């Protein structure tokens, strides 16, 4: 079994909610996962003090392997020269992780890909061919039966309410390659809503597709849709035949991340028994 604590869209800067940050830290120590994933947007405006605060925060979490990927907010928006010439300089200076990265944990292979695309998009992203080659080579080294996890910031499928902007361009072709790599689960953020989709939403088939697990904003005031004024993160457990996802929500007046309803989906390649659940149940 592989247990992952999945956060996203911390957005250190003006939107950051310190109480949510402290609640997430407490949850991390309660869970003590094998791995912590932060799928992009560590900062709000890619400023040095925001990157420093984000990394200081991550260093206060349990000392387990950490996967972080850039999001569109982690490249300069208004500093045009910097965006054009050295868009990831501040990331590389303050975050000691490559923008594309590989982490091995207890027989599992976790690959983080940078979907932020400062030259071609402001909000949306891109995944390039060389990045897919990078991921394939890493996954080819996975021990037999070991979980394969892919982390990107941008989403491949829109949430049920249609909010969140357009999915990644070329998503169908990318998801086909992800299926070919035998990836077990994709973890994303960006749209500030928690829900589960599947590569089967894009690519037809009679076997279970790759689960696409989205978490909302974990520590900012920018929750959207049903997560307005809420924060969220997921506990993801990769088991032999299934993947269990338990969303956790932090209310604006709360003091802790509280668990929602656990959802179990089949690992890719197994017979499909039920449709994917979409958004998680929300309590008012």
Which positions does each model-derived feature cover?
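Active-site neighborhood of phospho(di)ester-bond hydrolases with catalytic His/Asp-centered motifs
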Residues: 7-8, 36-41, 65-72, 114, ...
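A short C-terminal boundary segment appended to hydrolase-like catalytic domains
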Residues: 237-284
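Short acidic, glycine-rich surface-loop motifs adjacent to enzyme active sites
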Residues: 139, 143-159
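Extended active-site neighborhood of metal-dependent phosphoesterases/phosphodiesterases
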Residues: 52-134, 142, 177-179, 206, ...
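Beta-strand-turn-beta hairpins that frame and shape the catalytic cleft
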Residues: 1-5, 102-112, 143-147, 207-211, ...
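Active-site environment of divalent metal-dependent phosphoester hydrolases
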Residues: 13-15, 44-49, 53, 72-83, ...
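Conserved beta-sheet core of the metallophosphoesterase superfamily
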Residues: 163-239
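N-terminal active-site segment of His-dependent metallophosphoesterases
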Residues: 1-60, 78, 134, 141
């Amino acid at each position: 079994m592989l247990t992952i604590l999945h956060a996203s869209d911390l957005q250190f800067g003006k939107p950051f909610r310190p109480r949510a940050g402290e609640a997430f830290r407490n949850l991390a120590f309660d869970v003590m996962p094998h791995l912590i994933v932060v799928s992009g947007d560590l900062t709000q405006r890619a400023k040095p003090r925001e990157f420093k605060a984000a990394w200081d925060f991550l260093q206060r979490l349990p000392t387990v392997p950490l996967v972080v990927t850039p999001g569109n907010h982690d490249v300069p928006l208004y500093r045009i020269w910097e965006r054009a010439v050295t868009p990831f300089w501040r990331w590389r200076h303050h975050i000691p992780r490559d923008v594309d990265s590989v982490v091995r944990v207890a027989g599992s292979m976790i690959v983080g890909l940078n979907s932020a695309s400062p030259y071609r998009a402001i909000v949306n992203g891109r995944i390039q061919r060389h990045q897919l080659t990078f991921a394939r080579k890493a996954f080819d080294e996975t021990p037999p039966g070991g979980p394969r996890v892919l982390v990107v910031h941008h989403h491949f499928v829109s949430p049920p309410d249609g909010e969140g902007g357009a999915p990644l361009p070329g998503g169908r072709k990318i998801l086909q390659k992800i299926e070919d790599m035998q990836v077990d689960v994709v973890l994303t953020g960006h749209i500030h809503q928690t829900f589960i989709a599947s590569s089967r939403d894009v690519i037809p088939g009679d076997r279970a597709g790759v689960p696409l697990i989205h978490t909302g904003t974990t520590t900012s005031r920018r929750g959207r849709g049903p997560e307005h004024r809420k924060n969220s993160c997921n506990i993801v457990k990769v088991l032999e035949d299934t993947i269990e996802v338990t969303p956790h929500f932090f209310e604006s007046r709360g003091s802790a991340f509280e668990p929602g309803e656990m959802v179990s989906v089949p690992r890719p390649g197994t017979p499909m028994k039920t449709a994917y659940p979409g958004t998680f149940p929300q309590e008012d």
